[in-house]
From Swiss-Prot:
Lineage per the UniProt record: Bacteria, Pseudomonadati, Pseudomonadota, Gammaproteobacteria, Moraxellales
Example GO biological process: regulation of DNA replication
Family to which this protein belongs: Belongs to the DnaA family.
Region (Domain I, interacts with DnaA modulators) residue spans: 1-87
Species in which this protein is naturally found: Acinetobacter baumannii (strain AYE)
Entry protein name: Chromosomal replication initiator protein DnaA
Subcellular location: Cytoplasm
Length: 465
């Protein structure tokens, strides 16, 4: 039967939990080239439409060899079905607010925790805070220092209105999850009986839906609203999850009313989350929003050295510098590069040196050679400041050319693997000491001059995009 074949493929494509909870209970029939799937209620049909109908349609057409060209998902109102028409709620929203979704027949599932939770040591629930995500293992630099200091301050003033909620934002892989979980780990260490819950937006949705299906909505609400600290990762991914957004809105308000601390992360500043309910976005701005930026080269070096030290790996500083020059996007990629270097070193039975590093990162080096070069940096900087390229690399020392030139040299040192002499040659044959001085000047100017620092960040984004 076509649906049986589809189920076999869907089991391979989807997680066991999603397959058992959402796909297996569906009833199917094929009518004149249409595969009709029946779900117990409107909420179920909407979930399938939004998340899995496209995949099911592709599989149905492939496995039927073109016989089936359309897949429909309907509420099962047939006589004797799981949910007869007389039992259907008037609207999806009403169903969500007034009644749990009935448990489909023939589906047997093991009990699950209501949420991804870290609570006191006396709790039987699984502790999902990463024990490695502590303040002592977090490497601070200019790009994340304010966020780290704010998180420490939250611990001393838990629930204080000036930083509740605390909203950490920035691109993926920069340590936002590490910082928020560091707060949770530190709180549990100081107060073992504190109630701390960490979850992603996805797990919040899954756990909320699961509670609806099992008739345990009140238990879910109680767990979420009786906390001392709620940590939610990637809050922007709640977009489009209407019922879950409503529940999160009430949970958010309940915790704030009790002065319980909330920490959220997102890839964007709160007011840029235009796809979320404006009321919720407004509440995100009630406390304190702190950005986390890509680490500069000094911070990247320290991250590598600390990671190596904690792993018992001997990483020479010149090798850390080389890796940091090649991998600039985020901390996650940086750690991935180090893991690859360590793996190659162990495979060859050789200590880590520049030859091992170059061999390990040859794919990265090949890509960067095609994308970021000193010449490319010079072109982008000259266009950004609207100055002729010949003046950028020329001998004139007037401020209008000197500052962009220093900035370009600093970027070249950070983004390419070129040495000081090589960079100097690309800038009109200047010697290595001139380039070294320019790079040192860039570091000090970024600390002293906010406009210069902003120009540096803008160019960094342009070159990395």
């Amino acid at each position: 039967m076509l649906w049986t074949d589809c189920l076999t493929r869907l089991r391979q494509e989807l997680s066991d939990n999603v397959f058992a909870m959402w796909i297996r209970p569906l009833v199917a029939e094929e009518v004149e080239g249409i595969l009709r799937l029946y779900a117990p209620n409107p909420y179920w049909t909407r979930y399938i439409q939004e998340n899995h109908l496209e995949l099911i349609s592709i599989l149905a057409e492939q496995l039927s060899e073109g016989r089936v060209r359309q897949v429909e998902i309907l509420v099962d109102s047939r006589p004797g079905s799981i949910l007869s028409s007389s039992e259907q709620p008037a609207t999806t929203t009403a169903a969500l607010q007034t009644a749990p979704i009935p448990q489909p027949a023939k589906v047997k599932r093991e009990p699950e925790p209501v949420a991804n939770t870290a609570v006191s040591s006396k709790s039987s629930k699984k502790k999902l805070l990463n024990p490695q995500f502590t303040f002592s293992l977090f490497v601070e630099g200019r790009s994340n220092q304010m966020a780290a200091e704010t998180c420490r301050k939250v611990l001393t003033q838990l629930g204080a209105s000036q930083h509740n909620p605390l909203f950490l934002y920035g691109p993926t892989g920069l340590g936002k999850t590490h910082l928020m979980q560091a707060v949770g780990n530190a709180l549990l260490q100081a107060k073992p009986n504190a109630r701390v819950m960490y979850m992603t937006s996805e797990s919040f949705v899954q756990d909320f839906v699961s509670s609806l299906q099992k008739g345990k909505v009140e238990e879910f609400k109680k767990n979420c609203r009786s906390l001392d600290l709620l940590l939610v990762d990637d809050i922007h991914l709640l977009a489009g999850k209407e019922a879950s957004l409503v529940e999160f809105f009430y949970t958010f308000n309940a915790l704030l009313d009790e002065s319980k601390q909330i920490i959220l992360t997102s890839d964007r500043y709160p007011k840029e989350l235009t796809e979320l309910d404006p009321r919720l976005v407004s509440r995100f701005s009630w406390g304190l929003s702190v950005g986390v930026e890509p680490p500069d080269i000094e911070t990247r070096i320290e991250i590598l050295l600390k990671k190596a030290e904690n792993s018992g790996v001997d990483l020479p500083r010149n090798c850390a510098l080389f890796i940091a020059q090649q991998v600039v996007a985020n901390v996650r990629e940086l750690e991935g590069a180090l893991n690859k270097v360590v793996a190659i070193s162990r495979f060859k039975g050789a200590p880590i040196d520049l030859d091992v590093v170059r061999e390990s990162l040859k794919d990265v080096l090949a890509i960067r050679a095609r994308t970021i070069s000193v010449e490319n940096i010079q072109r982008v900087v000259s266009e950004y400041f609207r100055i002729p390229l010949k003046e950028l690399v020329g001998p004139k020392r007037t401020r209008i050319y000197a500052r962009p030139r220093q900035l370009a040299m600093g970027l070249a040192r950070e983004l390419t693997g070129d040495s000081f002499p090589e960079i100097g040659m690309a800038f009109g044959g200047r010697d290595h000491s001139t380039v070294m001085h320019a790079c040192e000047k860039v570091v000090s100017l970024r600390e002293e001059d906010p406009i210069f620092d902003e120009d540096y960040k803008n160019l960094l984004r342009l070159l990395q995009s």
